Design a protein with these regions (language model features):
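Short, solvent-exposed aromatic-acidic interface loops
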Residues: 43-45, 304-312
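Short, well-ordered beta-strand micro-motif
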Residues: 27, 41, 99-103, 120, ...
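Active-site-proximal alpha-helix that buttresses catalytic centers in soluble enzyme cores
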Residues: 53, 58, 64, 148-235, ...
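Short beta-strand micro-motifs in enzyme catalytic cores
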Residues: 21, 94-100, 151, 289-291
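Conserved Nudix-box catalytic region and its N-terminal flanking loop in Nudix hydrolases
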Residues: 33-76, 166-173, 178
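N-terminal strand-loop-strand
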Residues: 2-50, 152-157
């Protein structure tokens, strides 16, 4: 991963100043010398663009991006970093399209009414083929970042039962009913990133938060005791070093931790990388929220996207 790093908190459709919301992706796969990107031809407009489409009622924008990629290219995909928001005017009013980088996982293109041709091209050819300047801008953002070498989805546990009403050891305090529903919603969001492994700090509420995802994907939940609040407070450097080891694992890792850990890790990584957009003294970390952290080959943080806890 090379080029300019970035941080992004544009994670929710709430409050977006647009009449039409859409989502799409720069879909990439490994090529011989550079990534190959998927461009689709739309016969209705006779143009070449990245796969994208409108957000359906009840959908989240990340889900829309993955669904539209599948519908327009036939490819399964896993999301990477957010690239950009594109705004322009259509007959229905102001339109906003949010783009992710997304890795192609395989599939077969079938021509249809919406897209009748799919081409895999290198970034230079993509810049020549794209019909719209705003798509070229998105391409330039992707080229600047490059495909991530690895990602960590750093999740704060969902809402737990009241500490004051719990008689047992705090490590054993479980999720509340609200927290269990948040965990189920998180499973739907996190699955869009195609996790390869799932890990958790030791508290029961952390493990319960990622349990629905583990069940959905058929993966075990690995224990990461150094990344719980108590252990991290005793030796932050050891905890941060362990997190860097996890970030060096290829593919996508999920780690569920706590509010006393996540801001420290994100702030330290962003400061070390000189990442704009993250204030190390004000790192959000609400219960049920996720930081999607993308890393380069040297495990330097390259992009950071904050997703508040899902609401549906």
């Amino acid at each position: 991963m090379s080029g300019a790093a970035h941080a992004d908190r544009r994670d929710s459709t709430v409050g977006l100043d647009a009449d039409v919301l859409a989502a799409g992706a720069v879909l990439w796969r490994h090529g011989t010398q550079s990534p190959e990107l998927a461009l689709v031809h739309r016969p209705r407009y006779d143009d070449w663009s990245f796969p994208k489409g409108k957000v359906d009622p009840g959908e989240t924008m990340p889900f829309t991006a993955v669904r539209e990629v599948a519908e327009e290219t036939g490819q399964a995909a896993r999301l990477g970093p957010v690239l950009d928001d594109v705004r322009y005017t259509v007959p229905e009013g102001r339109k906003l399209v949010r783009y992710w980088a997304a890795e192609a996982l395989g599939g077969e293109f079938v021509p249809g009414d919406e897209t009748d041709e799919l081409r895999w091209v290198d970034p230079a050819h993509a810049a020549e083929m794209l019909s719209y300047r705003h798509d070229v801008d998105v391409l330039e953002r992707f080229t600047a970042l490059g495909p991530p070498a690895s990602m960590v989805l750093l999740v704060r546990h969902a809402k737990a039962g009241s500490r004051h009403q719990w008689d047992g050891h705090d490590m054993l305090r479980p999720l509340s009913e609200t927290g269990r529903e948040q965990a189920r919603q998180l499973a739907r969001l996190l699955a869009l990133f195609g996790p390869d492994r799932i890990a958790s700090a030791s508290p029961v509420r952390c493990r319960q938060t990622v349990a629905p995802l583990a069940e959905k994907l058929g993966l075990p939940v690995l224990d990461e005791p150094l990344l719980g609040e108590t252990e991290f407070a005793q030796d932050p450097e050891a905890g941060l070093a362990r997190f860097r080891e996890l970030a060096a694992e290829p593919g996508v890792s999920v780690l569920c931790s706590q509010g006393g850990v996540i801001p420290h890790i994100v702030g330290a990584l962003a400061t070390a990388a000189g990442l704009p957009g993250v204030d190390p003294d004000d790192v959000p970390s609400r219960k049920g929220s996720t930081w999607a952290l993308a890393f380069g080959e040297d495990t330097t943080l390259r992009a950071a996207d904050y997703y508040p806890r899902p609401t549906g």
